[in-house]
Amino acid sequence: MYAIIRIRGRTGIKKNIADTLDMLNLTRISHAVVIPETPSYKGMLQKAKDYITWGEVSEDTFKLLVSERGRLPGNKRVTDEYVKENTDYDSVEALAVAIYNEETTLKDSGLKPLFRLNPPRKGYENTKKTFVEGGSLGYRSEEINELLEKMI
């Protein structure tokens, strides 16, 4: 399961890349989404690689992301009471584990498909270079967890 974070804004962006970012629900800087690892999504990531960063999210980081930044329609926080009433799970943590293991989805559980994060503490490395070159863009594998923790 990939976590994707939008790093760069919308000024000067080509229309096909903007459309791809819209399909990924990444409309603003510091928004994050979680998607399964499928060939169609990998193609979308390659197309938008100059505006986003992504990597494999760990289960612990995903649980923290859902409990701290997960929202319901109306910008309400996700609570254990809501999860007990509206899903088959007992707590937010159990729901996060089920979503991580692809037993259910964010949409099926009633959560919004994106997470609005803060800019990272100590800032981005460089928003115009790839992660390999010492920047913030592109694929970063397990390092995405450190960035997410700085942004939650």
From Swiss-Prot:
GO terms for cellular component: cytosolic large ribosomal subunit. Keywords: Ribonucleoprotein, Ribosomal protein. Coiled coil: none annotated. Gene3D superfamilies: 1.10.15.30, Ribosomal protein L30, ferredoxin-like fold domain. GO terms for molecular function: RNA binding; structural constituent of ribosome. One of its GO terms (biological process) is maturation of LSU-rRNA from tricistronic rRNA transcript (SSU-rRNA, 5.8S rRNA, LSU-rRNA). It holds the Pfam family Ribosomal_L30. It comes from the Archaea. Part of the 50S ribosomal subunit. Belongs to the universal ribosomal protein uL30 family. This is Large ribosomal subunit protein uL30. It comes from Methanosphaera stadtmanae (strain ATCC 43021 / DSM 3091 / JCM 11832 / MCB-3). The lineage of its organism: Archaea, Methanobacteriati, Methanobacteriota, Methanomada group, Methanobacteria.
